[in-house]
């Protein structure tokens, strides 16, 4: 089995002032507890601030992220990154495919549209045993991994902003002869 390479965070710029939104679905309580434990430990290790908000299920996570990110920006206290935590276990119907696919798609859409670093820690598994193994901090620690992913992208975003402070990060329209007139 191949061992995944993890970002140790040791070469990362300080994230001490970072505000990280953690939105967790509590549908499977024991799994949610472990995912949250891993995520908050990773955020604390980066000396960032975590704000945890709970929603019923995975499909509600993208909605909550959109609402909370907008509200925080309005209050001039924007989030620097988001961590989404939850679990979807395949059942007997096609509901699993809808919840797993749509929650992931909506989160990616939000992340790209808002240029907001986001770690997706929504487990999509066949069995509860698989979910527990992936959630446990002592095993696969997917909650911690999701937080580390968000923190790594935030560090990249900050590093690029520091290189070019006069420019925003993201796409800029290409200027052509027609647009310059």
Curated annotation (Swiss-Prot):
<feature type="binding site">
    <location>
        <begin position="92"/>
        <end position="93"/>
    </location>
    <ligand>
        <name>(2S)-2-hydroxy-3-oxobutyl phosphate</name>
    </ligand>
</feature>
<keyword id="KW-0686">Riboflavin biosynthesis</keyword>
<dbReference type="GO" id="GO:0009349">
    <property type="term" value="C:riboflavin synthase complex"/>
</dbReference>
<feature type="binding site">
    <location>
        <begin position="58"/>
        <end position="60"/>
    </location>
    <ligand>
        <name>5-amino-6-(D-ribitylamino)uracil</name>
    </ligand>
</feature>
<feature type="binding site">
    <location>
        <begin position="87"/>
        <end position="89"/>
    </location>
    <ligand>
        <name>5-amino-6-(D-ribitylamino)uracil</name>
    </ligand>
</feature>
<dbReference type="InterPro" id="IPR034964">
    <property type="entry name" value="LS"/>
</dbReference>
<feature type="active site" description="Proton donor">
    <location>
        <position position="95"/>
    </location>
</feature>
<protein>
    <recommendedName>
        <fullName>6,7-dimethyl-8-ribityllumazine synthase</fullName>
        <ecNumber>2.5.1.78</ecNumber>
    </recommendedName>
</protein>
<dbReference type="InterPro" id="IPR036467">
    <property type="entry name" value="LS/RS_sf"/>
</dbReference>
<feature type="binding site">
    <location>
        <position position="27"/>
    </location>
    <ligand>
        <name>5-amino-6-(D-ribitylamino)uracil</name>
    </ligand>
</feature>
<feature type="binding site">
    <location>
        <position position="134"/>
    </location>
    <ligand>
        <name>(2S)-2-hydroxy-3-oxobutyl phosphate</name>
    </ligand>
</feature>
<comment type="function">
    <text>Catalyzes the formation of 6,7-dimethyl-8-ribityllumazine by condensation of 5-amino-6-(D-ribitylamino)uracil with 3,4-dihydroxy-2-butanone 4-phosphate. This is the penultimate step in the biosynthesis of riboflavin.</text>
</comment>
<dbReference type="GO" id="GO:0000906">
    <property type="term" value="F:6,7-dimethyl-8-ribityllumazine synthase activity"/>
</dbReference>
<dbReference type="GO" id="GO:0009231">
    <property type="term" value="P:riboflavin biosynthetic process"/>
</dbReference>
<comment type="similarity">
    <text>Belongs to the DMRL synthase family.</text>
</comment>
<dbReference type="InterPro" id="IPR002180">
    <property type="entry name" value="LS/RS"/>
</dbReference>
<comment type="pathway">
    <text>Cofactor biosynthesis; riboflavin biosynthesis; riboflavin from 2-hydroxy-3-oxobutyl phosphate and 5-amino-6-(D-ribitylamino)uracil: step 1/2.</text>
</comment>
<feature type="binding site">
    <location>
        <position position="120"/>
    </location>
    <ligand>
        <name>5-amino-6-(D-ribitylamino)uracil</name>
    </ligand>
</feature>
<dbReference type="GO" id="GO:0005829">
    <property type="term" value="C:cytosol"/>
</dbReference>
<dbReference type="Pfam" id="PF00885">
    <property type="entry name" value="DMRL_synthase"/>
</dbReference>
<keyword id="KW-0808">Transferase</keyword>
